[in-house]
Design a protein with these regions (language model features):
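ATP-binding/phosphotransfer module of carbohydrate and carboxylate kinases, centering on a glycine-rich
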Residues: 1-58, 67-73, 90-98, 115-122, ...
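Short hydrophobic alpha-helix segments
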Residues: 26-28, 78, 148
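A charged helix-plus-loop insertion that forms the helical arch/lid used to bind
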Residues: 73-85
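General beta-strand structural signal in soluble alpha/beta enzymes
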Residues: 100-104
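Hydrophobic alpha-helical segments within soluble ligand-binding/sensing domains
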Residues: 109-110, 121
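Glycine-rich phosphate-binding loop of actin/hexokinase-like ATP-binding domains
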Residues: 120-173
């Protein structure tokens, strides 16, 4: 039995992988106290393995960074600061005497999609998630490419323009980034129907852009254009067979995926990249779980 664990800022999910399918997925609260969290986690693992611990062969974990991937230790997580130094790999290996493998959540999701989702059948897969943040992971022949400093594919930090300001991709194209950009432009005097709302979120910006609001349309257009800049960078660097896009902003094709395809066709230099294979991811919330369990694939 291989267990996959998806650690999030507020909840942690655990499942086992059997014949390529997730079985018996359960979740617990991600406690801020790492000791209490570990106690809850081991209680849940015991439920999965039952009395015969010999059934357990490995535990894979996908978790938010920063992480010391060499040692499986958490660093200063923005949402879980008290976890700094939490050696989850060492603790689990000590309790269960099985190998434990830890990856950042974007890479785990990329592996899950490559092996069990939209990347099945492709030798090279680049996965992007666009949601409250932006993450990316590169998979070659069903293996995660980490890079020399474990930073391969971290496109969220790509330098981009943000309406005349030097910025990075996450601040222009993630959900919160889109909202902040719209708020900033309104504060600088640009008119928008968004000002009539009692607060607004990414869905509101997108909805007003659909209705023809000029400011909302400009913000969404730039968010997509900067994502295209990131996609072209990946295409030029590693030339993957398929680029998968997941996360909340990929749910509606006309929000990000179709604009990315259109702009890619308009701006990419090489003809194969202008018609690159851009697809919607398939596994969504289960991608990290699939990927965590797949850290033990042959």
């Amino acid at each position: 039995m291989i267990l996959g664990i998806d650690i999030g800022a507020t909840k942690t999910r655990l499942a086992r992988l059997e014949s390529g399918e997730l079985v018996k997925s359960r979740k617990i609260v991600t406690r801020r106290d790492s000791s209490r969290f570990f106690s809850d986690l081991t209680d849940l693992i015991e439920e999965f393995i039952g009395a015969d611990r010999s059934r357990l062969k490995g535990i894979g974990i996908g978790a938010p960074g920063p992480l010391d991937l060499d040692r499986g230790v958490f660093r200063k997580l923005p949402n879980l600061p008290s976890w700094d130094g939490f050696d989850i790999r060492g603790k689990l290996e000590s309790v269960y005497d099985v190998p434990v493998r830890v990856q950042n959540d974007a890479n785990a999701a990329a592996l899950g999609e490559a092996v069990h989702g939209g990347g099945r059948g492709f030798g090279s897969v680049y996965y992007i998630t666009i949601s409250t943040g932006i993450g990316g992971g590169l998979i070659m022949n069903r293996r995660i490419i980490n890079g020399a400093n474990y930073l391969a594919g971290e496109i969220w930090a790509l330098p981009v323009d943000n309406f005349g300001q030097r910025d990075i991709l996450i601040n222009t194209s993630s959900g919160p980034g889109i909202v902040r950009t719209a708020s900033r432009l309104m504060g600088e005097g640009s008119a928008s129907s968004l000002s009539e709302l009692d607060g607004f979120d990414t869905e509101d910006v997108f909805a007003q852009a659909r209705k023809g609001d000029p400011l909302a349309a400009r913000v969404m257009e730039q968010a997509a254009r900067n994502m295209v800049h990131a996609v072209i960078t990946i295409l030029l660097a590693v030339d993957p067979e398929v680029v998968l896009i997941g996360g909340g902003l990929a749910c509606a094709d006309d929000c990000m995926i179709n604009p990315i395809r259109r702009m890619l066709g308009e701006t990419a230099f090489f003809a194969p990249h202008r018609s690159a294979n851009i697809r919607k991811a398939e596994l969504w919330d289960e991608a990290v779980l699939y990927g965590a369990a797949s850290l033990f694939q042959p």
